[in-house]
From Swiss-Prot:
Residues that bind FAD: 8-11, 37-38, 43-45, 49-51, 163-164, 182, 283, 312-313, 315-317
Post-translational modification: Phosphorylated in the cerebellum; probably not by PRKACA, PRKCA or PRKCE. May be S-nitrosylated, which partially inactivates the enzyme.
GO cellular component terms, A-Z: cell projection; cytoplasm; cytosol; extracellular region; peroxisomal matrix; peroxisome; presynaptic active zone
The protein's required cofactors: FAD
Species annotation: Sus scrofa (Pig)
Gene: DAO
Name of the molecule in the record: D-amino-acid oxidase
Taxonomy, superkingdom: Eukaryota
Activity dependence on pH, as recorded: Optimum pH is around 9-10.
UniProt region (Required for protein stability), positions on chain: 1-16
Length: 347
């Protein structure tokens, strides 16, 4: 069975690992390849701050809530293990701030120690009148991609730097199953009017005294269009842009100033922080994740395609749950082709 995963961000690599982990012992041979025109450190995942936190609004597809929960549980199970540091994984606590009272998020029982802020805590943030505190997880994208790449390499998965122009090209190259994890560029392979870029620009600073994340919410401007501060293992991420439809990959000085001024107002000690990097990336924005099977016919043969893209600004938050779902769909393909000799492990 020849499987090609297109895309080498967190969605592509985690999906490749999940499939190989669950089927290598029951499907011989299982040949998995990863095709991508961008590998770490040049993917959208590399730009992500890495905080596990879904959007505050409930997803239109209830399955997404389950995939978020599965991902949190998977990551939490690695806390305290020798893998955690190499994965870029660590617990982090912090604040979500609002200018008015809002309902509790649907994920309040997924994270640890969720509670509303006290009046004394709100005194620290004079521009805000309401908020939450909880403990979550940081999963640093760049380090996690390196870890995933190492795990896949150990398993014999091969990586190819190439720009895929069509599914037909991959199918005619011998792929039995194609896993489409192309993120914001999925429309190149198959038109998808629901998919748009959500441009984000971030500033990385050296500010080791900052230990808590602070995410502000402006209900009129929308998600991630107000300041946020997220400490990581090596640096602190400052952000506050979410520009739907903007394909400009060049850092913008106006966005820089907006982010810097907003975050320094939120945390004045940042004025003394050294800027160590600035990056722009595109969140693959879609009303809901596209995770489904599709059969495409090229010449006289059918090729199975499993789509897994459109994760918006929460790819790291939902990635493992989606990988598990793709693995289930892959298992159904094998069953239909009578290729599964025994049940796969861990499904």
């Amino acid at each position: 069975m020849r499987v090609v995963v297109i895309g080498a961000g967190v969605i592509g690599l985690s999906t490749a690992l999940c499939i190989h982990e669950r089927y290598h012992s029951v499907l011989q041979p299982l040949d998995v390849k990863v095709y991508a025109d961008r590998f770490t450190p040049f993917t959208t995942t590399d730009v992500a701050a890495g905080l596990w936190q879904p959007y505050t609004s409930e997803p239109s597809n209830p399955q997404e809530a389950n995939w978020n929960q599965q991902t949190f549980n998977y990551l939490l199970s690695h806390i305290g293990s020798p893998n955690a540091a190499n994965m870029g994984l660590t617990p982090v606590s912090g604040y979500n701030l609002f200018r008015e009272a809002v309902p509790d998020p649907y994920w309040k029982d997924m994270v640890l120690g969720f509670r509303k802020l006290t009046p004394r805590e709100l005194d620290m943030f004079p521009d805000y009148r309401y908020g939450w505190f909880n403990t979550s997880l940081i999963l640093e994208g760049r380090k996690y991609l390196q870890w995933l790449t190492e795990r896949l390499t150990e398993r014999g998965v091969k990586f190819f730097l190439r720009k895929v122009e069509s599914f037909e090209e991959v199918a005619r190259g011998g792929a039995d199953v194609i896993i489409n994890c192309t993120g914001v560029w999925a429309g190149v392979l198959q038109p998808d009017p629901l998919l748009q870029p959500g441009r984000g620009q971030i500033i990385k600073v050296d500010a080791p005294w900052l230990k808590n994340f602070i995410i502000t919410h402006d209900l009129e401007r929308g998600i991630y269009n107000s300041p946020y501060i997220i400490p990581g293992l090596q640096a602190v991420t400052l952000g506050g842009t979410f520009q739907v439809g903007n394909w400009n990959e060049i850092n913008n000085i106006q966005d820089h100033n907006t982010i810097w001024e907003g975050c320094c107002r939120l945390e004045p000690t940042l004025k003394d922080a050294k800027i160590v990097g600035e990056y722009t990336g595109f969140r693959p924005v879609r009303p809901q994740v596209r995770l489904e099977r599709e059969q495409l016919r090229f010449g006289s043969s059918n090729t199975e395609v499993i789509h897994n893209y459109g994760h918006g600004g929460y790819g790291l938050t939902i990635h493992w749950g989606c990988a598990l779902e793709v693995a289930k769909l892959f298992g159904k393909v094998l069953e239909e082709r009578n290729l599964l000799t025994m049940p796969p492990s861990h499904l």
